Each structure stands twice: as structure tokens, then as C-alpha cells.
A protein has these predicted regions:
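Acidic, metal-coordinating catalytic segment for phosphate/diphosphate chemistry
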Residues: 1-16
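Hydrophobic "anchor" residues
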Residues: 25-26, 104
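A conserved beta-turn-beta hairpin within the catalytic core of GNAT-like acetyltransferases
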Residues: 35-39
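The catalytic Nudix box helix
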Residues: 42-74
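Active-site-adjacent beta-strand/loop module that shapes the phosphate/pyrophosphate-binding cleft
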Residues: 79-103, 138
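NUDIX/MutT-family hydrolases
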Residues: 106-137
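Charged phosphate-binding loop/patch that engages nucleotide di/tri-phosphates or the phosphate backbone
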Residues: 132-148
Length: 148
């Protein structure tokens, strides 16, 4: 296997909140910054060195959408290596969360917009493969429908 030169000498570890409300809608945010600029993802970001994982999760959710959440558990771990010249390597931990309030206040420096989206509308949103994979775990009936 040929050796690939990555931009950073370490793996970037990130945490993402899959926030599902009592109406079974998921909170999606349209990114205003790379990576995934312009695509719909769930709130999250990099874990700072020395920062506990769940503290990072709460911090990122508050920074991006102004919500407090209750963490329900780990959904999955996903690996992403950027296909472009940046050659970044990410390991992303996805946690299912329940919002303590649904009043979203998005941070325009990171998020162009935020929306509560019903599972039957998810196919209409442009999102990275990792996001679709995780949403298929949260809403397995959607994944079966998308496979047809």
C-alpha cells in the first residue's frame, strides 16, 4: 500500500450530537465553514486536548445551536478521511441526545441555518455519507426505504 502524506500528524477526534426531540425530529445544521461547507450535518466539533468527551459534546451543541441536551448514549463511531488535498483524518463519536428545549439559536459563524427535520424529509437534504449512515441507525425504517 502506498504511503499517504496527511496534513496533520494526528487523528482529529470529534463529537457529534444526534438531537432527537419528542416528535421524533432530528436537528440538522447547514455548515457555513469547512469541512462539509453548505451540507446538512448535526451539531458537533473537535474535542480539545484534555477535554472530557461529554463536556466537549455539551460545549459544541451550546456553541452551534444554543441548546442544552441530555445525553442518551453512544450511537456509533465513524471514521472519515477527506478525499481532497487536505488529507485530514477524523474519528467522530456520535451520541444520541434529547433537547431540554427546542428553541434553537444558531451561531452564524459556524452554522448557516438550523432546522428540526422529520425523518420522512431527510432524503431531501444534502449531507455527508457519515451523517446518512448515522441517521440510518437512528431511524432504521428510513434506511430500509432509502435502499429501494
Amino acid at each position: 500500500m502506498p504511503h499517504v502524506k496527511y496534513r496533520k500528524e494526528h487523528i482529529v477526534t470529534s463529537v457529534v450530537a444526534v438531537i432527537v426531540d419528542d416528535d421524533n425530529r432530528v436537528l440538522l445544521t447547514r455548515r457555513s465553514v469547512p469541512p462539509f461547507h453548505g451540507q446538512w450535518v448535526m451539531p458537533g466539533g473537535k474535542i480539545d486536548l484534555g477535554e472530557p468527551i461529554l463536556k466537549a459534546l455539551h460545549r459544541e451543541v451550546m456553541e452551534e445551536v444554543g441548546l442544552e441536551v441530555e445525553v442518551e448514549g453512544l450511537v456509533d463511531v465513524f471514521e472519515h478521511i477527506t478525499p481532497d488535498e487536505s488529507m485530514d483524518h477524523f474519528v467522530i463519536l456520535y451520541y444520541r441526545c434529547r433537547p431540554l428545549s427546542c428553541a434553537v439559536t444558531h451561531n452564524p459563524s459556524e452554522v448557516a441555518e438550523a432546522r428540526w427535520v422529520a425523518q420522512e424529509e431527510l432524503a431531501d437534504y444534502e449531507m455527508p455519507d457519515g451523517t446518512r449512515f448515522i441517521l440510518g441507525k437512528i431511524f432504521p425504517q428510513r434506511r430500509r426505504h432509502d435502499d429501494r
